[in-house]
């Protein structure tokens, strides 16, 4: 059995997950309803569709990680708990084959789910408005796929480090809280915590570049910044804090840097997860 065989077998098994398709179907129906009911204010059909997808991006930022985590949290932990990993490694396959095969299959599952979600939203938006800004929709899909892939990578990496379902669930829930909710909950988000430590505890002068840099470490914030790269000029949204109207953020806080944030969140968790899996006692 090769890496491709592992990926194909796991894809076939994972796509039967009722929880995964329940989440994807619910999200697809929700986006279709939003697309049907959305109407732009004094805008033409094409700009209305662009604003629609821009608005749905806020919802995707919170819900797409759930799709990715549900699809991937048991990728390797499930095999370890059931003992199936010993069968896979005895065929023979290397641990690298198992790790990459599982990653590829879960990416395939999530991509299929995302295609379904975007297809339903796009079909409803076109039927409602009679316009399709192909470049913007394709760009939003690409950015959303990249964002979702980050959480697939994180989930597979975490799954490779644990051997029990309960721990895999705890790791998935914890990652969602730390990387998503902690950046959006009013009063306790990461930027406020960084500001409190920097100013109140350490006694330094306010440094909004520092607070924004801390905020930019989240895949969610990177996703919101990346959406500015695919919408027409004038429809971008402010994502980071602006202490004053005249504030000009440094280059490392630019929208383009969101791609680097994604790259780091793809590479580092996978490297650590593979390293832990390679040395695990199975």
For each of these PLM feature ranges, what is it?
Residues 18-40, 57-69, 171-182:
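Hydrophobic alpha-helical transmembrane segments of multi-pass membrane transport/permease proteins
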Residues 34-38, 46-64, 105-166, 195:
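Secretory targeting signals
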Residues 48-53, 69-91, 102-103:
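Transmembrane helix boundary and interhelical loop/hinge segments in multi-pass membrane proteins
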Residues 65-72, 120, 154, 183, ...:
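Hydrophobic/aromatic residues in alpha-helical transmembrane segments
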């Amino acid at each position: 059995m090769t890496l491709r065989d592992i990926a194909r077998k796991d894809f076939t098994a994972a796509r039967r997950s009722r929880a995964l398709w329940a989440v994807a179907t619910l999200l697809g129906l929700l986006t279709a309803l939003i697309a049907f009911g959305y109407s732009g204010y004094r805008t033409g059909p094409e700009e209305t569709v662009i604003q629609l997808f821009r608005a749905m991006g806020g919802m995707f930022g919170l819900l797409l990680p759930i799709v990715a985590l549900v699809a991937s949290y048991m990728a390797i932990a499930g095999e370890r708990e059931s003992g199936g990993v010993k069968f896979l490694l005895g065929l023979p396959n290397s641990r690298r084959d198992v790790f990459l095969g599982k990653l590829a299959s879960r990416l395939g599952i999530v991509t299929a789910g995302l295609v379904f979600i975007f297809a339903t939203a796009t079909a409803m938006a076109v039927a409602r408005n009679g316009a399709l800004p192909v470049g913007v929709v394709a760009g939003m899909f690409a950015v959303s796929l990249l964002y979702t892939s980050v959480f697939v990578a994180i989930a597979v990496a975490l799954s490779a480090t644990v051997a029990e379902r309960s721990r895999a669930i705890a790791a998935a829930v914890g990652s969602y809280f730390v990387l998503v909710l902690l950046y959006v909950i009013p009063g306790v988000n990461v930027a406020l915590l960084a500001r409190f430590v920097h100013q109140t505890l350490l006694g330094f002068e306010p440094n909004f570049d520092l607070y924004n840099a801390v905020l930019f470490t989240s895949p969610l914030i990177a996703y919101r910044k990346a959406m500015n790269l695919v919408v027409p000029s004038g429809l971008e949204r402010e994502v980071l804090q602006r202490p004053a109207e005249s504030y000009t953020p440094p280059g490392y806080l630019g929208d383009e840097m969101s791609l680097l944030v994604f790259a780091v969140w793809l590479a580092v968790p996978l490297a650590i997860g593979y390293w832990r899996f390679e040395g695990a006692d199975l």
